[in-house]
Amino acid sequence: MKFPYRRFGGVARPVITLRLKWHSRSVRYDVLIDSGADECMFDAAVAEFLGINLEQGEMRKATGVGGQMVVYFMHPVDIEIGGRMHTIDAGFISRPGGPFEYGAVGQKGFFDKFIVTFDYLKQEIELKTRS
């Protein structure tokens, strides 16, 4: 599966749209494919839309960019990309300034499910499902 890079503020980024599912609810959601992220992280507003009780998940803490401590809650969700469904554990995080523009998919939950090729010159991402 190939996806074009998308522009945000004039900058090309490896952002794709996937479908997040939890029980009978689903939502299309933009995510940055982030090879530097340990886990998949999505905005708390998405959890709320899906009917996930945020604080019933496993609470974790991490240090974000700039050394700021952040708290997030892990929940199992399904992601659908290219018609294929994958169950992952994802962190949901609130941001005081409002929702994030897009989520992030990282090593656990994404790179362990797909072989990812970034081609910046072609402005293209290629995903191959691991067998």
Give the predicted meaning of each segment.
Residues 1-131:
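Pepsin/retropepsin-fold aspartyl endopeptidases
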